[in-house]
């Protein structure tokens, strides 16, 4: 059985003993009321962790607004601007998702790591097949599992260089086989918790099929601490699909069963 390094996200412990369901808000970041309402509905549906895109400083207002209305952990999704990560941490977010390769030079990554360490905020390193570093892509000629894992582990080592080990990893691909191979390879090389998902999963039917195969296979291997079934449209359906996957592989907790619904109930 894989030994998982314990990471705490608000009140949750990611240690391999329980699987947590995650979803992402899809309202405009300037629609604070709509975003808050959606977060509330996701929590009611059984979502354990909710993620919100923070594309600009104005969107930082989302963080206290959402945290005031829901009890589940809130993740800030940050791209390109390290200052957004710093502001999100100051605003009280529970976890930050970044790709260290696209937020600037090493000094900026260090500032994010130091700030998050001081506030005990975990960082999810989010690597996906569509945003591999150019030099890695040139070496492998394609976003292979080996290329994706090399990128993820480089960023892990970068954070570790700054004495930051409060890390969660995601290595996503729209190709299900590549996604499975990537996580299996990464699981052999490091013990950090892993967030499972298939990027660009697509429409509801195709998205559920791809996510079920990818996420389900890895859960059966004992890999994965949080999961997200990425679907277009209403994110509530992501929760129902995730519950069905957990039930199918026999890892549903009482919490998930209590709120369980299937897509046929919609």
Describe the predicted segments one by one.
Residues 59-76, 112-120, 186-191:
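Alpha-helix-loop-beta-strand connector modules within alpha/beta enzyme cores
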Residues 45-65, 100-103, 170-173:
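Glycine-rich, proline-tolerant flexible connector loops at the mouths of alpha/beta enzymes
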Residues 255-262:
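Conserved small/polar residues in nucleotide/adenosyl-binding loops
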Residues 21, 77, 125, 169, ...:
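Conserved, mostly hydrophobic/aromatic
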Residues 8-27, 62-64, 124-140:
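N-terminal small/glycine-rich loop or linker at the start of catalytic domains
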Residues 104-162:
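Conserved anion-binding
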């Amino acid at each position: 059985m894989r030994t998982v390094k314990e990471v705490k996200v608000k009140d949750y412990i990611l240690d391999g003993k329980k699987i947590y369901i995650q979803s992402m808000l899809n309202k405009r970041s300037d629609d604070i009321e709509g975003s808050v309402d959606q977060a509330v509905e996701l929590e009611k549906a059984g979502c354990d962790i909710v993620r919100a895109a923070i594309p600009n400083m104005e969107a930082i207002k989302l963080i206290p607004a959402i945290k005031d209305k829901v009890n589940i952990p809130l993740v800030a999704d940050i791209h390109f601007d390290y200052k957004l990560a710093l502001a999100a941490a100051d605003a009280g977010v529970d976890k930050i998702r970044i790709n260290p390769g696209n937020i600037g030079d090493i000094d900026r990554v260090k500032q994010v790591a130091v700030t998050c360490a001081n506030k005990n905020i975990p960082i999810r390193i989010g690597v996906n097949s569509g945003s591999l570093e150019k030099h890695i892509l040139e070496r492998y000629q394609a976003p292979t599992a080996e290329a994706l894992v090399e990128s993820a582990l480089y960023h892990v080592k970068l954070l570790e260089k700054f004495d930051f080990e409060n890390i969660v990893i995601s290595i996503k691909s729209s190709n299900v086989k590549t996604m499975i191979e990537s996580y299996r390879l990464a699981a052999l090389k490091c013990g950090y918790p892993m967030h499972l998902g298939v990027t660009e999963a697509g429409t509801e039917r195709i998205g559920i099929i791809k996510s079920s195969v990818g996420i389900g296979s890895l859960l059966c291997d004992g890999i994965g601490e949080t999961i997200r079934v990425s679907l277009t449209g209403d994110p509530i359906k992501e929760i129902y699909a995730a519950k069905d996957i957990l039930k199918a592989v026999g890892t549903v907790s009482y919490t998930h069963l209590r709120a369980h619904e299937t897509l046929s109930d919609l």
